[in-house]
A protein has these predicted regions:
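A conserved beta-strand-loop-helix scaffold within acyl/acetyltransferase catalytic domains
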Residues: 3-77, 204-267
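Hydrophobic pocket-lining residues that define ligand/cofactor binding sites across diverse proteins
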Residues: 83, 100, 279
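Conserved acetyl-CoA pyrophosphate-binding loop and the N-cap/start of the following alpha-helix
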Residues: 83-95, 270-274
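Conserved GNAT acetyl-CoA-binding A-motif
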Residues: 100-112, 283-292
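Active-site/acyl-donor-binding loops of N-acyltransferases
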Residues: 122-143, 262-422
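Amide-forming acyltransferase catalytic core, primarily the GNAT-like/NAT-type
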Residues: 129-156, 161, 173-175, 179-278, ...
């Protein structure tokens, strides 16, 4: 068996395996293999010229705590049916992680088909969503909730009546106050059939800047997202204000029993609240919103928190030494890391923090251990999906209680937002 990068002549077989393994529409598969999946981004295991198992590594950049770094989205891991349950997927994943490590990519992520398959191989939750269920009569109070990231507005500066959605209507007029003006200006929420990706990206970047982290989308990423969204019957809704243009958008799916809001991004709390209040009333059906795992600028019912993405460290030393840490913390710990796939990540590291927001990680084989964790647990800490309190509760890090508590101050709770499907 040979494991290597795919070439152009392998794409027909890669498509065969995809069609055999996934229930995607032919139009999507045509687009994906024509526009998205480049041979050099695929890795496969071959027996002679026969492709047995393969995956796709889509390049992305991640912004986390004010820093950006290259990453790869692991997509479409699949094996020909007659070659399954022979350990090929595990072998391919190991090769892939080492390949990424050589390219300087210390962190990769995926949307799992089975959580347990990946977590036992060293993946950990790196992206989770809050699932809100809103009734058609939901009212969003004008007063913003406290302690909210991003922009806030002064109380009493806005007026937002609950919209009435008449049958057949696709727009609603509202009253809005923008900036420091005191005059009321018209605002409108409407469905957009040909959205400008640049406009959506402007809103996405402005909105996500208040989050702890997110995936940065390129023009190509937006093209794929919109193609897939419309192919599945999705709609784009924009909230527009006079003088400032669109200030919020929604990736919306009308459903038979309930509507799904895949993503809502907004430049001000007022724009987000009005967009949500309008969509909650569409078709007089409940609205299910998959939102970031972060505080909102308006109160909503308690959500369900759902893990969506898993992350994997490929290079432990590089991941730990990337400057993501709060300044002012100093200390040294002998950290034992357990990695079920990569022996080069498995062992004892001397982790030293010098108070400048950076740490060093030096392998020290054979030394006594202060703290122990897995690569999956460390992925959770780095991404912020588990803050210190949850890390202690779930025993993601073990050792002396005082050492654990102090070390975890390096890893505050965050809200890395991921919501792309390929």
């Amino acid at each position: 068996l040979i494991t290597r990068r795919l070439q152009e002549q392998d794409m027909r077989q890669a498509r065969e395996i995809w069609e055999e393994s996934f229930n995607d529409k032919p139009a999507f598969i045509d687009w994906y293999f024509r526009r998205r999946f480049r041979p050099e981004e695929g890795i496969g295991i071959f027996s002679g010229s026969l492709l047995l198992c393969n995956l796709h590594l889509a390049p992305y950049r991640v912004r986390l705590r004010g820093r950006t770094f290259p990453s790869a989205y692991l997509i479409g891991l699949a094996t020909r049916e007659e070659y399954r349950r022979q350990g090929l997927a595990k072998e391919l994943l190991t090769f892939t992680l080492r390949s990424l490590r050589k390219k300087g990519v210390f962190f990769t992520f995926l949307m799992p088909f089975a959580m347990s398959f990946y977590t036992r191989l060293g993946w950990g939750i790196c992206g989770q969503h809050r699932i809100y269920r809103l009734s058609p009569a939901a009212i969003f109070p004008e007063k913003e909730s406290s302690g909210t990231p991003g922009k806030t507005e002064r109380a009493g500066k806005e007026s937002s009546p609950e919209p009435a959605v008449a049958a057949g209507k696709e727009t609603t007029l509202e009253l809005a106050v923008t900036g420091k003006e005191t005059a009321l200006e018209p605002a409108i929420t409407e469905k957009e059939t040909t959205p400008d990706p640049a406009v959506l990206d402007r809103i996405y970047r402005g909105w996500s800047s208040s989050l702890d982290g997110c995936l940065l989308r390129t023009e190509e990423d937006w093209e794929g997202l919109l193609f897939d969204h419309f192919l599945d019957g999705g709609e784009i809704w924009l909230h527009k204000e006079t003088g400032s243009g669109p200030t919020a958008y929604a990736l919306f799916y009308p459903g038979a029993k309930e509507n799904l809001l895949r993503e809502a991004a907004y430049l001000t709390p007022a724009a987000g609240r009005r967009l949500l209040q309008y969509l909650a009333a569409v078709n007089n059906k409940p609205l299910v919103w998959s939102a970031p795992d972060a505080a909102l600028p308006f109160p909503l019912p308690d959500p369900e928190v759902k893990p969506v993405f898993l992350g994997r460290i490929t290079d432990l030393k590089a991941a730990l030494e990337f400057p993501l840490y709060p300044p002012g913390l100093t200390g040294a710990w002998r950290l034992r890391v357990e990695d079920p796939l990569l022996p080069e990540n498995d062992g004892v590291f001397l982790v030293t923090a010098n108070g400048d927001g950076k740490i060093s990680a030096t392998p020290v084989p054979g030394m006594d251990v202060d703290l122990t964790c897995t690569t999956g647990g460390l992925a959770r800490l780095l991404s912020g999906t588990a803050g210190p309190e949850e890390a202690v509760k779930r025993r993601l890090l073990t050792g002396d209680d005082k050492l654990v508590s102090f070390f975890l101050r390096l890893f505050p709770k965050g809200d890395l937002y991921m919501n792309d499907y390929f």
